[in-house]
Amino acid sequence: MQVLVRDNNVDQALRVLKKKMQREGIFREMKQRKAYEKPSVRKAREKAEAVRRARKQARKTAIREGLIAAPKPKARPVSPRRPAAPAPASSPVGAA
């Protein structure tokens, strides 16, 4: 996998690399290969993943054809703005 580093901005290049690796599924595969997985467990996992993919595809098709209503987008919480910095308290000159 190759990433361009522009203007010596290594942080941005690392972010791009991580995003590419995430998209390719490398992190998931590394996690799976960390320990041995029995063939029977692997087969069961792959079957469950296939069922999940088929359900997702069927749901998307049904939404596209209008058979079921599309889910409402989640309302994003509005974060309160920071209050303006209070003006420094000015003390009266004569008060002590």
From Swiss-Prot:
List the InterPro entries: Ribosomal_bS21, Ribosomal_bS21_sf
Q: Which domain of life is it from?
A: Bacteria
Which cysteine pairs make disulfide bonds?
A: none
Keywords of this entry: Ribonucleoprotein, Ribosomal protein
Q: Which residue ranges are recorded for the region named Disordered?
A: 52-96
Q: GO biological process annotations for this chain's record?
A: translation
Q: What GO CC terms are in its UniProt record?
A: ribonucleoprotein complex; ribosome
Name the Pfam families for this protein. Ribosomal_S21
Q: Does the keyword Membrane apply?
A: no
| Recorded GO MF terms | structural constituent of ribosome
Q: Bias category Low complexity: which stretches?
A: 69-96
Q: Which family does it belong to?
A: Belongs to the bacterial ribosomal protein bS21 family.
Q: Which NCBIfam families match?
A: S21p
Identify this protein by name. Small ribosomal subunit protein bS21
Question: Which organism is this entry from?
Answer: Methylobacterium nodulans (strain LMG 21967 / CNCM I-2342 / ORS 2060)
Q: What is the organism lineage in this UniProt record? A: Bacteria, Pseudomonadati, Pseudomonadota, Alphaproteobacteria, Hyphomicrobiales
